């Protein structure tokens, strides 16, 4: 095994986040009341300022996962940014007075951050997708943004990484030192991955963008604009992947509507968790 030195980030106690955009309360989950340019601004500022953190792109699926899992709810509360990925989260936010709130769709966020990164010189690493997808995405992004710096890709297995795979990933990231690791897994896998590996990988930010890898490489067709604006993109996804998604949408959508009614009519109080983040210290370790 190579004796190359790796850098591991060890989490300290969670501390209150510095000033950040206001949050809408979606069933107790704090979703930042922002639009696409503001989300890209936060990400850009974090990189320039040397902050370490992860970004969650969260819609109804993520909000409902947080109802079932305290661990997942905590992961969202510790995110640098939780963007409103679905129109229902935007509608609820606007009802709460966040009239400027707009949808921040994962694939759109990826393109906007990549576009801005060229002038800033920020670098990227692609983690996720089925075999060949990350490399395909690298080619797609390079064709669209010829000056973009994509310093590595990694296709994970559909399970937890083995110790050998962990070491291999850490070595690759340590050698390339990307500013951003884009994580293209499904919810909640990508959020769990970012939380578990944020302090173990030598990068600044991790951004979970779900289906963006498949959408940008044409594996999944994107929904028409009118379906996105009307909150019906889930129907478009369901049409393409009925056997995989029908249970998710049936359980999550129905459950969300029921719980949201309780919140909106003040029949149940969903307390908003304090936004936290981990302070970090650097520790050199040899593997």
Per-range role (PLM):
Residues 60-63, 185-190, 212-213:
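Short glycine-rich anion-binding loops that position phosphate/pyrophosphate groups of nucleotides
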Residues 138, 191-200:
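Short Gly/Thr/Asp-enriched flexible loops that form oxyanion-binding sites at enzyme active sites
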Residues 52, 122, 201-204:
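A short helix->loop->beta-strand "cap" motif at the edges of active sites that frequently abuts
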Residues 155-161, 202-240:
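Short, flexible loop segments at boundaries between secondary-structure elements
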Residues 2-108:
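N-terminal nucleotide/polyanion-binding subdomain common to many enzyme families
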């Amino acid at each position: 095994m190579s004796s190359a030195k790796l850098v591991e980030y060890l989490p300290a106690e969670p501390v209150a986040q510095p000033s950040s955009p206001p949050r809408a309360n979606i069933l107790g989950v704090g979703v930042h009341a922002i639009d696409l340019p503001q989300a890209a601004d936060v990400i850009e500022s974090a990189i320039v300022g040397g902050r370490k953190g992860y970004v969650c792109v969260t819609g109804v699926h993520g909000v409902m996962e947080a109802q079932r899992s305290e661990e997942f709810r905590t992961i969202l509360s510790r995110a640098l940014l939780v963007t409103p990925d679905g129109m229902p989260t935007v509608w609820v936010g606007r009802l709460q007075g966040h009239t400027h709130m707009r949808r921040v769709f994962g694939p759109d966020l990826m393109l906007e951050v990549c576009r801005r990164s060229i002038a800033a010189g920020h670098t990227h690493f692609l983690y996720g997708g089925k075999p060949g997808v990350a490399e395909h995405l690298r080619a797609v992004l390079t064709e669209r943004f010829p000056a973009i710096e994509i310093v590595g890709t990694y296709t994970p297995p559909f399970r937890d990484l083995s110790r050998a795979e962990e070491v291999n990933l850490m070595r690759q990231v340590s050698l390339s030192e990307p500013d951003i690791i884009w994580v293209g897994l499904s919810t909640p896998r990508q959020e769990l991955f970012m939380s578990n590996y944020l302090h173990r990988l030598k990068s600044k930010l991790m951004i979970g963008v779900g289906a963006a890898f498949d959408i940008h490489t044409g594996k999944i067709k994107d929904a028409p604009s009118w379906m996105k604006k009307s909150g019906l993109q889930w129907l478009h996804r369901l049409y393409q992947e009925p056997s995989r998604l029908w249970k998710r949408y049936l359980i999550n959508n129905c459950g969300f509507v029921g719980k949201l009614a309780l919140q909106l009519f003040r029949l149940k109080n969903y307390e908003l968790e304090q936004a936290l983040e981990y302070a970090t210290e650097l520790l050199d370790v040899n593997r």
